[in-house]
Amino acid sequence: MNIKKQTGLIAAMILLYGNSFGQIKESGSEKSGGGAKPAETYFDLMITTASTNLNYGSSNSALSDYKEPVKGIHAGVSFQAGITSKFSLVSELYYIRKGGELTANNPITTQKTILRLNAFELPVLARFHFGKFYMNAGPSIAYNFSGTRKVDDVSAAISFNNSTNGFKRMDAGVQIGAGYMFPIKQKRLALDIRYCYGLTNISQDQEMFNRGLIISVHFSNPWKKNPLAKNKTT
Protein backbone atom coordinates (compact mmCIF):
# COMPACT_ATOMS: atom_id res chain seq x y z
CA MET A 1 0.00 0.00 0.00
CA ASN A 2 1.53 3.34 -1.06
CA ILE A 3 1.77 6.47 1.06
CA LYS A 4 -1.22 8.20 -0.60
CA LYS A 5 -3.51 5.24 0.12
CA GLN A 6 -2.26 4.99 3.71
CA THR A 7 -2.84 8.70 4.29
CA GLY A 8 -6.31 8.53 2.76
CA LEU A 9 -7.29 5.55 4.90
CA ILE A 10 -6.10 7.19 8.12
CA ALA A 11 -7.81 10.48 7.22
CA ALA A 12 -11.07 8.66 6.50
CA MET A 13 -10.92 6.94 9.88
CA ILE A 14 -10.29 10.24 11.65
CA LEU A 15 -13.30 11.80 9.90
CA LEU A 16 -15.42 8.77 10.79
CA TYR A 17 -14.38 9.07 14.44
CA GLY A 18 -15.13 12.77 14.54
CA ASN A 19 -18.53 12.35 12.93
CA SER A 20 -19.50 9.36 15.10
CA PHE A 21 -18.26 11.00 18.30
CA GLY A 22 -20.16 14.21 17.55
CA GLN A 23 -23.40 12.39 16.78
CA ILE A 24 -23.17 10.25 19.89
CA LYS A 25 -22.43 13.22 22.14
CA GLU A 26 -25.45 15.02 20.68
CA SER A 27 -27.63 11.94 21.20
CA GLY A 28 -26.39 11.63 24.78
CA SER A 29 -27.21 15.28 25.46
CA GLU A 30 -30.74 14.88 24.14
CA LYS A 31 -31.36 11.87 26.40
CA SER A 32 -29.83 13.31 29.55
CA GLY A 33 -32.23 13.45 32.43
CA GLY A 34 -34.37 10.71 30.91
CA GLY A 35 -33.05 7.84 33.00
CA ALA A 36 -30.65 6.63 30.31
CA LYS A 37 -28.38 3.69 31.06
CA PRO A 38 -25.04 5.01 32.40
CA ALA A 39 -21.85 4.79 30.37
CA GLU A 40 -19.61 1.92 31.45
CA THR A 41 -15.89 2.35 32.10
CA TYR A 42 -13.59 -0.62 32.67
CA PHE A 43 -9.91 -1.40 33.19
CA ASP A 44 -8.91 -4.75 31.68
CA LEU A 45 -6.06 -7.20 32.00
CA MET A 46 -5.63 -9.35 28.90
CA ILE A 47 -3.42 -12.26 27.97
CA THR A 48 -3.62 -14.74 25.11
CA THR A 49 -1.81 -15.79 21.95
CA ALA A 50 -1.85 -14.08 18.57
CA SER A 51 -1.55 -15.67 15.14
CA THR A 52 0.48 -13.39 12.86
CA ASN A 53 1.82 -13.48 9.33
CA LEU A 54 3.64 -11.28 6.83
CA ASN A 55 2.44 -9.81 3.55
CA TYR A 56 5.19 -9.36 0.96
CA GLY A 57 3.39 -6.97 -1.38
CA SER A 58 1.98 -7.35 -4.87
CA SER A 59 5.44 -7.78 -6.39
CA ASN A 60 5.95 -10.99 -4.39
CA SER A 61 2.46 -12.49 -4.67
CA ALA A 62 4.01 -15.87 -5.56
CA LEU A 63 5.09 -16.20 -1.93
CA SER A 64 1.49 -16.60 -0.75
CA ASP A 65 1.66 -20.38 -1.23
CA TYR A 66 4.75 -20.61 0.99
CA LYS A 67 3.61 -18.50 3.95
CA GLU A 68 2.79 -19.95 7.35
CA PRO A 69 1.53 -18.07 10.43
CA VAL A 70 3.44 -18.05 13.70
CA LYS A 71 2.00 -17.95 17.21
CA GLY A 72 3.07 -15.34 19.73
CA ILE A 73 2.28 -13.99 23.17
CA HIS A 74 -0.11 -11.04 23.48
CA ALA A 75 -0.47 -9.51 26.95
CA GLY A 76 -1.20 -6.07 28.38
CA VAL A 77 -3.88 -3.70 29.62
CA SER A 78 -6.97 -2.05 28.14
CA PHE A 79 -9.03 0.93 29.28
CA GLN A 80 -12.60 1.43 28.08
CA ALA A 81 -13.80 5.00 28.68
CA GLY A 82 -17.57 5.06 28.34
CA ILE A 83 -19.00 8.11 26.57
CA THR A 84 -22.61 6.91 26.46
CA SER A 85 -24.21 3.51 26.98
CA LYS A 86 -23.77 2.89 23.24
CA PHE A 87 -20.28 4.26 22.60
CA SER A 88 -16.84 4.07 24.22
CA LEU A 89 -13.26 5.03 23.46
CA VAL A 90 -10.74 2.27 24.12
CA SER A 91 -6.99 2.64 24.54
CA GLU A 92 -4.66 -0.31 25.01
CA LEU A 93 -0.98 -0.99 25.63
CA TYR A 94 0.39 -4.48 25.25
CA TYR A 95 3.37 -6.61 24.36
CA ILE A 96 2.97 -8.71 21.24
CA ARG A 97 5.21 -11.10 19.37
CA LYS A 98 4.66 -10.84 15.62
CA GLY A 99 6.24 -12.41 12.56
CA GLY A 100 5.81 -14.99 9.86
CA GLU A 101 7.30 -18.08 8.28
CA LEU A 102 8.35 -18.93 4.73
CA THR A 103 8.64 -22.63 3.98
CA ALA A 104 11.66 -24.06 2.17
CA ASN A 105 12.13 -23.83 -1.61
CA ASN A 106 10.12 -20.63 -1.95
CA PRO A 107 10.81 -18.13 -4.79
CA ILE A 108 13.22 -16.10 -2.59
CA THR A 109 15.29 -18.77 -0.86
CA THR A 110 15.63 -22.53 -0.70
CA GLN A 111 15.72 -22.42 3.10
CA LYS A 112 12.96 -22.27 5.68
CA THR A 113 12.88 -18.80 7.27
CA ILE A 114 11.08 -17.61 10.40
CA LEU A 115 10.99 -13.92 11.34
CA ARG A 116 9.89 -12.84 14.82
CA LEU A 117 9.44 -9.29 16.10
CA ASN A 118 8.96 -8.23 19.72
CA ALA A 119 6.88 -5.07 19.96
CA PHE A 120 4.89 -2.78 22.22
CA GLU A 121 1.63 -1.76 20.54
CA LEU A 122 -0.82 1.05 21.30
CA PRO A 123 -4.23 0.95 19.56
CA VAL A 124 -6.97 3.57 20.06
CA LEU A 125 -10.39 2.21 19.15
CA ALA A 126 -13.94 3.44 18.73
CA ARG A 127 -16.26 0.88 20.35
CA PHE A 128 -19.98 0.60 19.59
CA HIS A 129 -22.12 -1.37 22.06
CA PHE A 130 -25.17 -3.49 21.19
CA GLY A 131 -26.19 -4.99 24.50
CA LYS A 132 -23.51 -7.50 25.49
CA PHE A 133 -22.07 -7.48 21.97
CA TYR A 134 -19.71 -4.78 20.68
CA MET A 135 -17.76 -3.81 17.58
CA ASN A 136 -14.59 -1.74 17.52
CA ALA A 137 -12.11 -0.30 15.04
CA GLY A 138 -9.27 2.18 15.00
CA PRO A 139 -5.61 2.94 14.30
CA SER A 140 -2.61 1.51 16.11
CA ILE A 141 1.09 2.26 16.40
CA ALA A 142 3.81 -0.17 17.45
CA TYR A 143 7.47 -0.02 18.42
CA ASN A 144 9.60 -3.02 17.44
CA PHE A 145 12.31 -3.23 20.10
CA SER A 146 13.93 -6.53 19.09
CA GLY A 147 13.61 -9.46 16.75
CA THR A 148 15.20 -12.60 15.33
CA ARG A 149 15.47 -14.31 11.97
CA LYS A 150 15.83 -18.08 11.97
CA VAL A 151 17.14 -19.72 8.80
CA ASP A 152 16.81 -23.49 9.06
CA ASP A 153 18.23 -24.14 12.55
CA VAL A 154 20.37 -21.00 12.85
CA SER A 155 18.85 -17.99 14.65
CA ALA A 156 20.31 -14.46 14.69
CA ALA A 157 19.20 -11.05 15.92
CA ILE A 158 17.93 -8.66 13.26
CA SER A 159 19.18 -5.08 12.92
CA PHE A 160 17.08 -1.92 12.94
CA ASN A 161 18.91 0.43 10.56
CA ASN A 162 19.03 1.52 6.92
CA SER A 163 21.31 -1.31 5.82
CA THR A 164 20.41 -4.24 3.60
CA ASN A 165 18.28 -6.75 5.52
CA GLY A 166 17.54 -4.03 8.11
CA PHE A 167 14.13 -3.38 9.66
CA LYS A 168 12.15 -0.37 10.88
CA ARG A 169 11.24 0.07 14.52
CA MET A 170 8.00 2.02 14.03
CA ASP A 171 4.92 0.32 12.62
CA ALA A 172 1.41 1.69 12.04
CA GLY A 173 -1.79 -0.11 11.19
CA VAL A 174 -5.53 -0.43 11.67
CA GLN A 175 -7.53 -2.89 13.75
CA ILE A 176 -11.12 -4.03 13.40
CA GLY A 177 -13.06 -6.61 15.34
CA ALA A 178 -15.83 -7.50 17.74
CA GLY A 179 -16.41 -9.00 21.15
CA TYR A 180 -18.91 -10.34 23.64
CA MET A 181 -19.14 -9.46 27.34
CA PHE A 182 -20.07 -11.87 30.13
CA PRO A 183 -21.13 -9.93 33.27
CA ILE A 184 -19.93 -11.44 36.57
CA LYS A 185 -21.49 -9.45 39.42
CA GLN A 186 -19.83 -6.00 39.24
CA LYS A 187 -17.04 -7.28 36.99
CA ARG A 188 -17.05 -8.82 33.54
CA LEU A 189 -15.24 -11.25 31.28
CA ALA A 190 -14.95 -10.33 27.60
CA LEU A 191 -13.97 -12.36 24.55
CA ASP A 192 -12.44 -10.14 21.84
CA ILE A 193 -11.60 -11.13 18.25
CA ARG A 194 -9.63 -8.67 16.15
CA TYR A 195 -7.88 -8.46 12.77
CA CYS A 196 -4.74 -6.31 12.54
CA TYR A 197 -3.71 -4.83 9.19
CA GLY A 198 -0.24 -3.31 9.00
CA LEU A 199 0.21 -0.20 6.85
CA THR A 200 3.96 0.29 7.31
CA ASN A 201 6.57 -1.49 5.23
CA ILE A 202 8.78 -2.73 8.08
CA SER A 203 11.66 -3.88 5.84
CA GLN A 204 14.40 -1.64 4.46
CA ASP A 205 15.02 -3.58 1.24
CA GLN A 206 11.74 -5.32 0.30
CA GLU A 207 7.98 -5.12 0.85
CA MET A 208 6.93 -6.60 4.19
CA PHE A 209 3.74 -5.78 6.13
CA ASN A 210 2.41 -7.24 9.36
CA ARG A 211 -0.92 -9.07 9.47
CA GLY A 212 -2.47 -10.67 12.52
CA LEU A 213 -5.50 -12.27 14.13
CA ILE A 214 -5.84 -11.76 17.89
CA ILE A 215 -8.30 -13.70 20.03
CA SER A 216 -8.04 -12.44 23.59
CA VAL A 217 -9.75 -12.81 26.93
CA HIS A 218 -10.23 -9.63 28.98
CA PHE A 219 -10.60 -9.69 32.76
CA SER A 220 -12.38 -6.42 33.61
CA ASN A 221 -12.85 -4.32 36.73
CA PRO A 222 -15.18 -1.28 36.77
CA TRP A 223 -13.54 2.15 36.83
CA LYS A 224 -15.70 4.54 38.83
CA LYS A 225 -14.37 7.91 37.64
CA ASN A 226 -14.67 8.84 33.97
CA PRO A 227 -14.58 12.53 32.92
CA LEU A 228 -15.68 11.62 29.36
CA ALA A 229 -19.05 10.17 30.34
CA LYS A 230 -22.06 12.20 29.22
CA ASN A 231 -24.48 10.85 31.82
CA LYS A 232 -22.40 11.01 35.00
CA THR A 233 -24.13 10.45 38.29
CA THR A 234 -23.94 13.11 40.98
List each language-model region with its residue ranges.
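Cleavable N-terminal export/targeting peptides
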Residues: 1-39, 222-234
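Short glycine/proline- and aromatic-enriched beta-strand/turn motifs that initiate or cap beta-hairpins
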Residues: 21-78
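Outer-membrane beta-barrel channels and translocator barrels
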Residues: 38, 82-86, 130-133, 183-185, ...
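Residues that define the transmembrane beta-barrel architecture of outer-membrane proteins
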Residues: 39-41, 69-73, 116-120, 131, ...
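Glycine- and aromatic-enriched membrane insertion/assembly motifs of diderm outer-membrane
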Residues: 44, 62-110, 120
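Residues on the lipid-exposed face of transmembrane beta-strands in outer-membrane beta-barrel proteins
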Residues: 45-49, 73-83, 93-95, 122-128, ...
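Flexible, solvent-exposed loop segments that connect beta-strands
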Residues: 54-67, 98-118, 145-170, 203-205, ...
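Outer-membrane beta-barrel "beta-signal"
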Residues: 182, 209-234
